[in-house]
Amino acid sequence: MASWTKIYMLEEPKLEKPVLVQGLPGLGFVGKLTVTYLIDELKLKPFARLYSTHLTLLDGSTGVHINSNGTFFLPKLEFYAYNQKKPNIVFLTGDTQPTVYGQYEVAEYVLDFVQKYGCE
């Protein structure tokens, strides 16, 4: 099966040398909960979404989940921008992590994407 990873823009943020803060589910959900809390407190909206065949569904499989009502769920990671104070921050979060065999491809897409905004 051919793999793919795509980032879809929702809006173009204005950022100045931002820092990337990633919070994905893992041991204890500490990173995920922290980033989600900050996103909620700062009332941020996503500016981009990453979709990939390397992101797992909630049951650990990959692909598309089709609900009983015919709607579907495709796993994604979301980017949020905070530019009210310095340093500007790009938050990355989602409900899943990349597969072991796809983590480098997804990481490469994420890093290439945030470097366009000046992240180092």
Locate predicted features.
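N-terminal short beta-loop-beta anion/metal-coordinating cradle
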Residues: 1-95
